[in-house]
Structures are given as C-alpha cells and as structure tokens.
A protein has these predicted regions:
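Structured interaction and signal-relay segments at domain junctions
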Residues: 18-80, 275-276, 297
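Catalytic core of PPM/PP2C metal-dependent serine/threonine phosphatase domains
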Residues: 19-31, 153, 157-166, 216-296, ...
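A short, aliphatic-rich beta-strand micro-motif
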Residues: 83-86, 91-102
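Acidic loop->beta-strand submotif enriched in PP2C/PPM serine/threonine phosphatases
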Residues: 90, 258, 294-335, 375-378
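Amphipathic alpha-helical "output/dimerization" segments
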Residues: 116-136, 221-224
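Active-site-proximal, acidic helix/loop segment immediately C-terminal to a metal-coordinating Asp/Glu
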Residues: 119-122, 212-232, 296, 320-373, ...
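Regulatory cytosolic signal-relay segments
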Residues: 126-187
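Conserved beta-strand-loop-short alpha-helix elements that form
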Residues: 199-212, 272-274, 314-335, 385
Length: 405
C-alpha cells in the first residue's frame, strides 16, 4: 500500500490526495481515511476534501473543522499520540493519528480499523507519515493548501515572512528547535532562521523597524544576507557585518535588531552576538533561569560600526535556550499591563515541568500572549526555543514519531 501510494504521489496534486489515500489504504484494512491540516495559528484542524478553491469544500456529513483545544483530534495533535475515538459494535473503531514531518506537526488523520487488527494499526501510523511527506512536498506550490490553512486575510509583509521562514519545528536525536510568531496574518519586521551544518546549529532572530511592508522587506534582506554569509563560512561577527553592509546599501536607512547564535551539539558550546536585541535566556533543571549578558553592537543598518562582543557559555543536557523579540514581553492587556519577562519565563518553566514538548509549549505560549492582549497584538512577537539533549542525544528507540498509549 505504502509503495503504491508513494509511487502515485509523484504525479498527484493536492486535490487528488484525499481520494488516493482512501483508495490505497483500504487494501490493508484501513478505511474511511480523513485528512485534517492545522491552520497557521494552530487553533483549528481543517478537513482536506480535495474540492473547491481551498481543497476543503463539500465535506458531506463529515466535520469540516475541529478546534485543537478540547477535541479528540486536537488531543492527538497536541500530544503527538494516537487517540481512540468511537468504538463500534462490530469490532471497528476510529483512530486519530498525528501527521508529522519529522517533528513538524502538519495535522491529523482519522481512520476506521478493526480493534483486533494490529497490522492495520501499524499501517495506519505509516500511512500518516506518508501523508505528511506528500503534503510537505506538494505544499510549496499548492494555493489550495495555503488557502485552507488560513482563517483570515494576510498582509503582503506577512506573505513575505511566511515564505521565507524554515519550518516551525525541527528535531534530531540531539536537539529540538521550535518557533512561534504572531500576529500571523499581519507580521511586519519579525522573523527567525535556523540551520544545521554538521555539528553546528545556527540560530537567528530579527526584528526590523516598523510594521509595514518595508519592514518585511528589510527583515527579508537581513535573512538573505545572513544565509549568504553563513553558507560562505562566515563567523558570527562577520555575518553581522555582511548584514549591516547590505542594509546600509539597500534598505534606505532602515535597521534591524538581531540575535545570532551557534551551538555545537556535540560539546554544548554556545556562542552568540547581539545587535540591539533582547538577551537570550537559558532554562536549566526545569527552574533555574539565566539571562545571557553580552555587550551588544548597535542595530544592523545604522552604520555606527559598534562591533558586538562574541560571548560563550557551556550548555548542559536538558537546557532550553530562548531567543525572542521584544514583542513577546511587551504585549499589553487592555489595562496596559505588559505580559512581562517573568510571566514569559515562568510559562516556559511550568511547561517544562509538565513534560510538555517544545512545539506544544510554544503553541500555548503564543496563544497565552494573544489572550493577554485581547487577541490582537500591536507589535510582532517572535520566540525561538532550542532544547539540547546532550552529546549522546536521545536513544532512537525513544524517538518514535507517534506514541500509542
């Protein structure tokens, strides 16, 4: 089944995916397959029907949209665990399974299988993985999927940022990286970047001045210059200088604040530089919080030629590193009270103590910040969280993508 579906997928459109999955899955005892994808803000799960301009029309008798909070499919999405739904008298049951591309949560599938068919249970999990790979491979050129994942109109600046960003989640056996940012549909100058090269993880958070399309273009230029320098082997300060040069030449007086960092995932050695940006934070042992002080340079693009200090620290296995923009802590409620630094780190500490995974921690954090600001932010808010597992990493047997309770 999986081989046939994968072969067929090479010439398959996003609209053809739901029908093809049902057709191939029934041969192995997996029936009534439905595919749900998460929206950009990870608030709801939407049914992919393959029909209409957003591939989500004409759901028939099926539920077109589930909230992620307080539903069975939402629980499968949040916990990354298979969840059993309805159990029928004839020995069949419904199962909800997370759809994952690595650690990136795409959505969930619902299947109907016999409760005593262990092979069908396993095949359903493999099917979820294949569905994820197909969606990710077709997504970059599918307007239908992009429409389905949106719950509102998007500004041009936000369009630039979403097309520029790497996936919101990455994981291997040594490190987990997650990111979240709002307002999803009105992003201005905030963005982030990360990449892995050998034993080195590169991290960056940018905050461009302004909240308009020009801010989006400025941060896009900063990310492009950063990547260009990084791919040519530049160090942190040289990378910052190349971003500075591009902005001075091209951005017309606009500037960005930035935090650039590198982590050796074999040794835990972390290096970072700051350009007018909030200091990184390390959470250790689930409770201890340390702000990483470092003499900053001036924001990039100001042409003031103040070079930042390159600072280093040794991380310990289990440490969580936070890079963020000022919008995270400066979001205000209707009474003008800030969300604040302490509330920010306390939220991460509590989530860590509860054993919450990085992606779900950030999803809940960003919704908490939105709730604090009555659902609408005046400034961009971005957070990048890295969790280091140590030089030996996590045993691969403990990294099953879908957990069956």
């Amino acid at each position: 089944m999986l081989r046939e579906l994968l072969t067929a997928s090479h010439l398959m459109s996003m609209e053809q995916l739901p029908g093809a999955v049902c057709e191939y899955a029934k041969d192995v005892g997996v029936h009534d397959v439905l595919i749900y994808v998460a929206d950009l803000q990870q608030t709801v799960l939407r049914l992919l029907t393959g029909k209409g301009h957003d591939a989500g029309r004409d759901p028939g008798d099926e539920v077109a949209e589930y909230p992620i909070q307080g539903t069975l499919p939402g629980r499968a999405y949040q916990t990354v665990e298979a969840v059993t739904g309805r159990v029928f008298d004839d020995g069949r049951c419904e199962r909800w399974l997370p759809v994952l591309d690595g650690a990136e949560r795409i959505g969930v599938i619902r299947v109907t299988i016999r409760t005593d068919d262990a092979q069908a249970m396993a095949d359903a999990e493999y099917l979820a993985g294949i569905v994820a790979l197909i969606i990710v491979s077709k997504g970059p050129y599918s307007d239908s999927l992009s429409r389905l994942m949106r719950t509102g109109p998007m500004t041009v600046s936000a369009e630039i940022q979403w097309r520029l960003m790497p996936p919101l989640t990455f994981a291997n056996d040594q490190v987990v990286i997650g990111a979240a940012l709002e307002p999803a549909y009105r992003l201005g100058g905030d963005t982030f970047d990360y990449a892995l090269a050998g034993d080195t993880v590169h991290l960056a958070v940018f905050d461009a001045m302004g909240h308009d399309t020009a801010a989006g273009l400025t941060s896009a230029l900063a990310v492009a210059a950063c990547r260009n320098a990084r791919l040519q082997g530049a160090g942190l300060v040289e990378t910052g200088q190349r971003i500075e040069d591009e902005l001075v030449e091209q951005a017309g007086g606009r500037f960005v604040t930035a935090a650039l960092a590198e982590l050796n995932i074999r040794t835990g050695d972390l290096s970072w530089v700051l350009y007018g940006h909030p200091e990184p934070v390390v959470l250790r042992g689930g409770r201890k919080v340390r702000e990483l002080k470092c003499s900053p340079g001036t924001p990039l693009g100001t042409d003031l030629e103040i070079v930042p200090e390159v600072c280093t620290v040794q991380l310990e296995p289990g440490d969580r590193l936070l890079l963020y923009s000022d919008g995270i802590i400066e979001a205000r409620d209707p009474d003008r009270h800030e969300f604040g630094f302490q509330r920010f780190v306390d939220f991460i500490v509590r989530s860590n103590a509860d054993g919450m995974a990085v992606p779900e921690t950030l999803r809940r954090l960003i919704h908490s910040i939105l709730g604090h600001h009555d659902g609408r932010l005046d400034d961009d808010a971005t957070v990048l969280l890295l969790e280091w597992h140590g030089p030996h990493g996590v045993p691969r047997d403990d990294m099953a993508p879908i957990k069956s309770p």
